[in-house]
Each structure stands twice: as C-alpha cells, then as structure tokens.
Amino acid sequence: MKLLIAFIVGLVAAPTLVALAGVTGRLPSDAMSEPPKWESSVGMRALEASLEGRAKGLENPIAANDAAAFAAGQKLYADNCAGCHGSRSGPSKWGASGFYPRVPQFWQKGTDVTAEQAYAAVHDGIRYSGMGAWRDLMKDDDIWKVANFVARIKPMQSASKSAR
C-alpha cells in the first residue's frame, strides 16, 4: 500500500514541480542553450505521435518512381526549405543552432518520416516551432512533391560511404 501511495504522489508531484519551475522562470526559454534530455525526448515523441496521427488517411497522389515530380520537389525544397533545413552544401547557417526546437538538418541526418508525415508538417505546420503552414502559400500538388523529396533525403555521410 505504501508503494502505491508513493507512486501516486510521484505521478502528481513530478508534473507539478516541472510546471512550477516553468511558471516561475526556472526553465530556460532561450533558443541557444541545450535543452534538458527529458524535454527533448518528450517533445520529439509528442511530435512523432502527432505527425503519425495527422498522416493517417492521407493518400499520396504521386508515384514513388515519378522522376519529374522528384526533380520538381528537389527544386521546391531548394527554393523554399533549404534556408532552414540545409542543403547538400551544408547545414543552414542559422537554422541549425538559432532555433529551438532545433530545425532538422535533413542533409546531415536524413529523414525518417514518410511522405504523408512530411506533407502534414508542410501543409499545416508544426506548433511551437518555426515551421509555419504552407497550405496558403503553395499548391497542394507542390506540397506533395516537396514531401516526397524530403521523405527520400538520405544523410550525406551515408551516401559518401556507400560510394566508396
């Protein structure tokens, strides 16, 4: 019984202490400091779960082997996304360190999102980040082209190793 009470108290106390630290200004809010591991872990898992849920039911209208759509997606990425997410020539000068949460640098780490998840992120944006919604700025077909391209980006290090 004591163990159960301790467990319940822990369930209530831990989030209460974190919330209290947050509202009293004891948690860092700047974009440059490295966040605590628990914060990154909770935030990334919540984002992954959200993207998985938002992608359910979406049907990608572009065939995976559509070379013209891939080339168009690559151009759209270079014109609209590389400034934050980096390119083959390197990470974004400011997107890699001046944002929190950090802006994913796809060319350095690759992606582990499906085209449907990338579409959901581009179309509707990501709350509490610098990723805005593009649905009013880009045609739906173009969002799918970018999403297909992003889902296929592999890290440059892996690509150079496999070329050896």
Set out the residue ranges of the language-model regions.
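Extracytoplasmic electron-transfer domains, predominantly the class I c-type cytochrome c fold
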Residues: 98-152
